[in-house]
Amino acid sequence: MKTIIVFLSLLVLATKFGDAKEGVNQKQKKEVTQNEFREEYLNEMAAMSLVQQLEAIERALFENEAGRNSRQKRCLGENVPCGDNIPCCGKLACEKTAGYGWWYKSPYCVKPTSG
């Protein structure tokens, strides 16, 4: 109990006499914050303009890439039904075959016959 009273009395004394130079401290704080905010604000504005420029460049690059269809579209493998809407893979051809085709009445993706 005695230690609590000692600490509370020290706390009261520290808060009472802690800010003896309040006017000087406030002026210094104001000057420091004004200078810091001025420099930081200018630096932040420069960084924001740089970010906006980079975003514009990135947007332009991605627009060009999206227009080129750089990725191959999905396609079907061998011995799979195909049609106008469902393409076969690059080296396969969509043909009516004597195997599955007669039963399902649809063309299938097969290796192209030479001849």
From Swiss-Prot:
One Pfam short name: Toxin_22
Species, as recorded: Trittame loki (Brush-footed trapdoor spider)
GO cellular component: extracellular region
Family the UniProt entry places it in: Belongs to the neurotoxin 14 (magi-1) family. 03 (ICK-30-40) subfamily.
Compartments (UniProt record): Secreted
Entry remark concerning the domains of this protein: The presence of a 'disulfide through disulfide knot' structurally defines this protein as a knottin.
Endpoints of the signal sequence: 1-20
Name of the protein: U17-barytoxin-Tl1b
Disulfide bridges in this chain: 75-89, 82-94, 88-109
